[in-house]
Amino acid sequence: MSHTALHELGAHELLAGYRARTFSPLDVAQAVLAQIERWEPHIAATWLLRPELALAQARTSEARWARGEPCGALDGVPITVKENIATAGDPVPLGTRAVALAPAAADAPPAARVREAGAVIVAKTTMPDYGMLSSGLSTFHAISRNPWDVSRTPGGSSAGAGAAAAAGYGPLHLGTDIGGSIRLPAAWCGIVGLKPSLGRVPIDPPYMGRAAGPMTRDVADAALLMQVLSRPDARDSMALPPQAIDWSLAWRADKPLKGVRIGLLLEAGCGLVVEPAIRVAVEHAAHLFEAQGAVVTPMPPFMTPELLAGLDHFWRMRSMLDLDALAPAARDSVLPVIREWAESARGMSGADVFRAYAATHATRVATNAAMQAFDYVISPVSPNAPAPFDWPSPTNDPLRGLEHIGFTVPFNIGEQPAISVNCGYMDSPGTPGAALPIGLQIAGQRFDDLGVLQMARAFEQLRGPQRAWPAVPGKA
């Protein structure tokens, strides 16, 4: 076992340590809680941080390991859960003061699976109001920040999960993604974030494009978590049929790259222009795959400004109706940027809404058609560096809030698995001398979640040494 601090160890290393009795789940929980105490004043990543409850779970796990009777694949491994994933008895505020704090009746499917597997739920993690922003800006939580540079956003809407993973709040973190909300924080925080195929991980409530998935520091831990999350749950009416997938192949077996057909997508076709440093990093990743025998072919963009606008307008109308259902005082407590964005749908006709919804189908068709010539598509996750921590989006414009998701959202609507894995670093625009991670997106054919993980694992092995994880401000 390495001399790495316990809070820095991956889930596989922790489980090996428990089996060897080198350390216990209680030792690890205490180390993770100490790390959270060091970092949390700087990044505000957690909600419902209850140390005594976490320690009680760890003691119970410790007793199971002492008897040689671990209860599941994650027994004793610390995990955080995004606050919109219900945990029994806890409120689900959705990042906003507008939601009444009523206790959830039951665990949502992802929370139920990790609890059954013995994971120690250390905390819930933060999100912006209704998960509608690519930042940690919230009327309910303190604003979450990026550990690599606390003047920048960690991304969103899985803001706290991304920040927590980068800061070392244990190895496993659960996020959700409907347009990039796992992959954007993963990219901007330098971690791994998988948006599975639609329905691969049962959720409640299900919705078009919405997925829950792992956010971890490496691919092996993401695959281990998928082994648990992908188990069936009848509450998800959009779930895929149960399938026997050997997720361990993502870390046990190298994926041959010779002849693999990779599309290189460097322009989204809509939204913001890719920053030069990000383009260079993604092109370098393509060269690494090509050197191993993969066939890399530049591909034209398949999204258009009209498709992105259609998605945007449909979500505006959905949000307007959600806000209209609130009492006036609750509605007034929602972030002004979200209220302005949603209110802009007020003048839409029924025909406008239908055309906006039709853009979702057109996006699905375009995405699936573009994927047909390739086994995988690689691209930037985001065209831009993380914005200032208090901006709602990279444009800081309520009516242009989705212009950075042109690379991510097609794979929500098209239902393909897509992962972010770190592929380099760029200078922070906010702090001289600070570096910010760059995310490579790898998308695969529908249902090929294992293949996407294997490609990301192959890239981890090709990319070379990474920078050290960020240090607590003032402690470097």
Task: Label every model-predicted segment.
Residues 106-233, 412-425, 429-441:
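Short glycine/serine-rich loop segments
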Residues 195-284, 303, 462-476:
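A short helix-breaking turn/cap at a secondary-structure junction
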Residues 54, 64-139:
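Acidic/His- and Gly-rich active-site-bordering loop/insert found
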Residues 13-19, 63, 256, 266, ...:
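Serine-dependent amide/ester hydrolase catalytic core
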Residues 74-94, 253-266, 314-368, 420-437:
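Short helix-loop capping/hinge segments that flank enzyme active sites or metal/cofactor-binding pockets
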Residues 22-30, 59, 247-251, 274-300, ...:
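Acyltransferase
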Residues 1-56, 291-293, 468-476:
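An N-terminal boundary/leader segment
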Residues 32, 54, 222, 262, ...:
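Residue-level signal for inorganic ion chemistry
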